[in-house]
Swiss-Prot record:
It comes from Canis lupus familiaris (Dog). InterPro entries: Brdyknn_1_rcpt, Brdyknn_rcpt, CCR1-9-like, GPCR_Rhodpsn, GPCR_Rhodpsn_7TM. This is B1 bradykinin receptor. Its main location: membrane. Belongs to the G-protein coupled receptor 1 family. Bradykinin receptor subfamily. BDKRB1 sub-subfamily. One of its GO terms (molecular function) is peptide binding. The chain crosses the membrane at residues 42-62, 73-93, 111-131, 151-171, 205-225, 249-269, 293-313. One of its GO terms (biological process) is inflammatory response. This is a receptor for bradykinin. Could be a factor in chronic pain and inflammation. It comes from the Eukaryota. Keywords: Cell membrane, Disulfide bond, G-protein coupled receptor, Glycoprotein, Lipoprotein, Membrane, Palmitate, Receptor, Transducer, Transmembrane, Transmembrane helix. A lipid is attached at residue 327 (S-palmitoyl cysteine). The lineage of its organism: Eukaryota, Metazoa, Chordata, Craniata, Vertebrata. It is a multi-pass membrane protein. Pfam families: 7tm_1 (PF00001).
C-alpha cells in the first residue's frame, strides 16, 4: 500500500509508489476525508499565529541598543527558526487541500520540504543548546558563558541543520503517483539500497534520540540543583530572575518534547513497516494517518513558544509593554484649565 503522505516529514519513496503484488487495504476514507477538509484550515491558523507570535518575540529580543544575553541569543534563534518554518506551511495546507497533488512545481517542492526538514534538526539542536546553557548557569555557575561562544554555537547549529536537509533537496521531485490517478505529487525518491536505515538513523537517532538524551541529562541535573531553592517556588510570582528564566526554559523544553515525540514514534513505526518488521493493513493505516496528525501536532510547537513567553515570562511581558509604548503614537500633552482660560481671555480682548 502506498503512503498517502508525500511531504518531507511523511516521505514517500520510489519503492512505495507501485509495490508489486501489494495487498490492497481499506485506507479509512472517512479519516482521510476529514483530514483533507479540516487540517488545511488548522495549518493556516497555526501559520498566522506562529508568524505573528515569532515576529513579536524577535521584535522584543532584537530591540535596538540592547545586548542579548546567552539564553536570549538561543531563544532568538529558535524564534527565527520557527518563523522560517511557518512560512512554508501554507504550501503544505494547499497540498493537503488538493489531496496531495502538488501544484507549485519542482523548485518549491524541494525548497519547502528542505526548509521543513532543516527546521526539524535546528529546533531540537537549539533546545539542547538552551538546556546546556541553563545547566551551566545553575549547576556550574562559575563556568564562563560567553556570547561569542553562543554565536558560534548558533551558526554551527544552522549549518548542521542545513547539511542534514541536503538529501531532501537532492531526492525530492515531482512524480506521477498511480495511487493519485497518475497526478503529480511531491515525493521523496530515495536511491535503492539501505536508505531506509540511513534515513532512520538521521531522523530518529540524530534528530531525536541523541538530542533527547542530552536534554534529559541537562534538565535532570537542573531540577536536582534547584530542588528546595526558594527562587524556584517564587519563579512565577516575582522571584529572582534566574529562577524565572529557568521556569521559562523548562516550559519550553517540556512543550517541545510533548509536541514532537508523537511524530518520531510514528516515523520509527514507518521504518518498521518499510523493512517489514511490522506488517498488515491495520499498521499501514495506523502509520499513515498517525504520521499526518502527529506532524500537525508538531507544527503547534512553532506557535506555542510565543504563548509560553507571554504566560511564563514576566520580564517578556514587561518588554512587550515597553515596545508597545515606544511604537504607539504619543498623545499631545494635556493643557491645564488655567492655560485655556488665559488663551480665551486673550482671544476676547482682541
Amino acid at each position: 500500500m502506498a503512503s498517502r503522505a508525500p511531504l518531507e516529514l511523511l516521505p514517500l519513496n520510489r519503492s512505495q509508489l507501485s509495490p508489486p503484488n501489494a495487498t490492497t487495504c481499506d485506507d479509512a476514507p472517512e479519516a482521510w476525508d476529514l483530514l483533507h477538509r479540516v487540517l488545511p484550515s488548522v495549518i493556516i491558523i497555526i501559520c498566522v499565529c506562529g508568524l505573528l507570535g515569532n515576529l513579536l518575540v524577535l521584535a522584543v529580543l532584537l530591540r535596538p541598543r540592547r545586548r542579548l544575553n546567552v539564553a536570549e541569543m538561543y531563544l532568538a534563534n529558535l524564534a527565527a527558526s520557527d518563523l522560517v518554518f511557518v512560512l512554508g506551511l501554507p504550501f503544505w495546507a494547499a497540498n493537503i487541500s488538493n489531496q496531495f497533488r502538488w501544484p507549485f512545481g519542482g523548485l518549491l517542492c524541494r525548497l519547502v520540504n528542505g526548509v521543513i526538514k532543516a527546521n526539524l534538526f535546528i529546533s531540537i539542536f537549539l533546545v539542547v543548546a538552551i538546556s546546556r546553557d541553563r545547566y551551566r548557569a545553575l549547576v556550574h555557575p562559575m563556568a564562563t558563558r560567553r556570547r561569542r561562544q553562543a554565536r558560534a554555537t548558533c551558526v554551527l547549529i544552522w549549518v548542521a541543520g542545513s547539511l542534514l536537509s541536503v538529501p531532501t533537496f537532492l531526492f525530492r521531485s515531482i512524480e506521477a503517483v498511480p495511487e493519485l490517478n497518475n497526478d503529480s505529487a511531491c515525493v521523496l525518491l530515495h536511491p535503492p539500497g539501505a536508505w531506509h536505515v540511513a534515513r532512520m538513523v538521521e531522523l530518529n537517532v540524530l534528530g531525536f534520540l541523541l538530542p533527547l538524551a542530552a536534554i534529559v541529562f541537562f534538565n535532570c541535573h537542573i531540577l536536582a540543583s534547584l530542588r528546595g531553592r526558594p527562587e524556584v517556588r517564587g519563579a512565577r510570582c516575582g522571584g529572582p530572575p534566574d529562577g524565572r528564566t529557568t521556569a521559562l526554559i523548562l516550559t519550553f523544553v517540556a512543550a517541545f518534547l510533548v509536541c514532537w515525540t508523537p511524530y518520531h514514534f510514528f516515523a520509527f513505526l514507518e521504518f518498521l513497516t518499510q523493512v517489514q518488521v511490522v506488517r498488515g493493513c491495520f499498521w499501514e493505516n495506523f502509520k499513515d494517518l498517525g504520521l499526518q496528525y502527529a506532524s500537525f501536532f508538531a507544527f503547534i510547537n512553532s506557535c506555542l513558544n510565543p504563548v509560553i513567553y507571554v504566560f511564563v515570562g514576566r520580564l517578556f511581558r514587561t518588554r512587550v509593554w515597553d515596545l508597545f509604548k515606544q511604537c504607539a503614537p504619543r498623545r499631545p500633552p494635556a493643557v491645564s484649565w488655567s492655560h485655556r482660560k488665559r488663551v480665551l481671555q486673550l482671544f476676547w480682548q482682541n
